[in-house]
């Protein structure tokens, strides 16, 4: 307990009608060079609206580049060469970027064919990002 409240690490807000909205987790927040907060979960939710994206992880290794690793849906690979897959996923990210404020836009896109490891509640385990090596993934842009 902290100040009489349970500290879960969740970040959110109450709207005018006192509805609670969870926007992210405190430990995942990216603070860019301009001091603006970027919530990876918000960007991931935008990407999930595409039927091309099975899963994604958004992060920053240097607080100026917003990076995404995308696991495309299997249909994206069907009867396509890798260059076509890369273009399809990159175009999907460009569409997502149009919906985001400029400081939240993704500027590096990687593709993986592997499933992300998940918790028992089906959230992606982000601990692998500490050892992120771009050579382990397919660059899409």
Which residues does each PLM region occupy?
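Alpha-helix boundary recognition
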Residues: 1-2, 48, 130
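AMP-binding/adenylate-forming catalytic core of the ANL superfamily
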Residues: 11-102
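Active-site metal-binding loops of divalent metal-dependent hydrolases
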Residues: 4, 10-11
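Conserved C-terminal "lid"/linker of ANL adenylate-forming enzymes
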Residues: 30, 94-141
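Flexible, active-site-adjacent loop/turn segments at secondary-structure boundaries
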Residues: 3-4, 28, 36, 114
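A structural signal for the hydrophobic beta-strands that form the central parallel beta-sheet
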Residues: 7-8, 22, 111
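Adenylate-forming AMP-binding core of the ANL superfamily, especially NRPS adenylation
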Residues: 1-3, 16-17
